[in-house]
Each structure stands twice: as C-alpha cells, then as structure tokens.
A protein has these predicted regions:
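A short helix-loop-beta-strand connector motif used in the catalytic cores of GNAT acetyltransferases and
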Residues: 68-91, 140-146
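Conserved acyl-donor/pantetheine-binding loop and adjacent beta-alpha core of acyl/acetyltransferases
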Residues: 92-151, 157, 208-209
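Conserved active-site alpha-helix within GNAT-family acetyltransferase domains
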Residues: 163, 175, 186-203
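C-terminal "cap" of GNAT-fold acetyltransferases
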Residues: 178, 182-187, 206-224
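A short beta-loop-alpha structural element at the N-terminal edge
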Residues: 30-44
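N-terminal amphipathic/basic-hydrophobic helices that include classical n-h-c signal peptides
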Residues: 1-21
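Conserved acetyl-CoA-binding loop-helix of GNAT-fold acetyltransferases
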Residues: 158-171
Length: 224
C-alpha cells in the first residue's frame, strides 16, 4: 500500500470526506446518518456487538467496560467529528474521514477512566493505552476513510445488516477514489472483510505473544 499515493489530492484541497458523504445513497439503503443525539445508541449497539470480541475482552474484560469505552468514543469523536450510520434492525458504524483530527475531551477521558475503575478489570486503562499506541503505529499515513467499528445487535445477526452497513459507504469511496482502512479484532470476521475487497497488511499482538491479535486491513478503491 503506497503511503503517499494520494497526497496530491489533499494538496489541492480536495475534501474527500464531503465527496464520499455526498455519494452515499441513503435513499435506497436502510441507513440513517446519526446525529449528535444518537451517540448513546451508536455506542450501545457497538458495545453489544463487541461484547465477546477477543481483543476487547482481553483489554477491558467486561461488557460494561467495553460499552463505557465506546460511549466515550461515540460521544466525543465519531458522532460529532466523524460519520456514523444506524440501521433500523440494530446496526451501527463509526467512520472517520481523511484529514479529520479528533480526540476525546478531558471530561470524556475522565469518564472513561471512571468507567474502567468501576466496571473494568485491573490494568484495563494501561492495556487500553498500550493498544492505542500500537494501533497508531500501524495506522497508514496515506489519506483514507477509516472504519473504526461496524457491528450489530445479537438479534440482528445473520440478516445481512453488516453488509447493508458497509456496502453503501464502500460504493461511495469507490466513486470518490478513496481507499479504506480498518483493524480487524476478530479472526472470525476476516472472510467478511476480504469479501468486500479488504487485504491484510499484517498482524500484531495486542500485548505479549499469547495475547489476541489485530489484523490491519486496507482496501483500494475499485474502478467503476
């Protein structure tokens, strides 16, 4: 994956995030763009989807702790500064467009820390910080749309909700010529992402050799 292949577009001031969002066909899909009042819904669907995720279980330990983390990320970063979609049958995504810099607020970080102290397992905050550092080390420098999370409720599984969440955005990225990046935290999902054009960039352990692995994946835009 070339790190600087798309730098000329940014130098010309092209707003890829707006281009992609304009091309997403929400009218013929079941998706709805989340607004600021939807942060808890986005987070709680995501928390339910990742409750048994190997990486999140290793880092945070409990479903309540995992949900607490996603509430901070949805409220402070992805709903106000990124792009989040909701599916009526119980699905949600959190995306970040290229060139957008966002971080949790100080209050959000305090709420996260408090949530981990109350609900998490010992060492959860440190493990979370270490994972964040490793994710940053692997994160590509080349501009891209970043898929932070995609997930469904337990009741929505097996109904094609995941594909319905992903395909409209990938189609829009193809139309705008924008690559996509994600980190797969569950080996069971590798085939799903591969079927949508993602290729593995590598793999890294969350902590030591016996810890779960993350699988960074990259998708080049497909020609029309």
């Amino acid at each position: 994956m070339p790190q600087d292949a798309y730098s000329s577009d940014l130098a010309l001031g092209t707003n890829w995030g707006d281009r992609v969002q304009m091309q997403i066909d929400l009218q013929t899909s079941a998706l709805r763009l989340a607004n600021r009042q939807d942060w808890r819904t986005v987070a709680d669907i995501t928390g339910e989807a990742f409750a048994n995720d190997p990486v999140n279980q290793y880092v945070f330990g409990k479903a309540s702790s995992i949900r607490s983390m996603f509430r901070v990320m949805a409220r402070d970063m992805y709903v106000p500064h990124g792009m989040c979609h909701l599916h009526p049958e119980g699905g949600a995504t959190m995306w970040m467009p290229p060139g957008v810099e966002a971080a949790p607020t100080m209050l959000g970080l305090l709420n996260f820390a408090a949530g981990q102290v109350l609900n998490g397992t010992p060492g959860a905050i440190k493990r979370g910080m270490n994972l964040s550092e490793k994710m940053q080390e692997w994160h590509p420098r080349a501009p891209h749309f970043y898929l932070f999370t995609i997930g469904t409720t337990l009741a929505a599984r097996g109904k094609g909700v995941g594909k319905s969440l992903l395909k409209p955005v990938l189609d829009a990225c193809d139309g705008a010529g924008v690559p996509v990046y994600l980190e797969n935290s569950n080996p069971a999902n590798s085939g799903f992402y591969a079927a949508h054009g993602f290729e593995r960039m590598g793999v890294f352990n969350v902590a030591g050799d016996e810890s779960p692995v993350m699988e960074p994946m990259w998708r080049e835009p497909l020609a029309g």
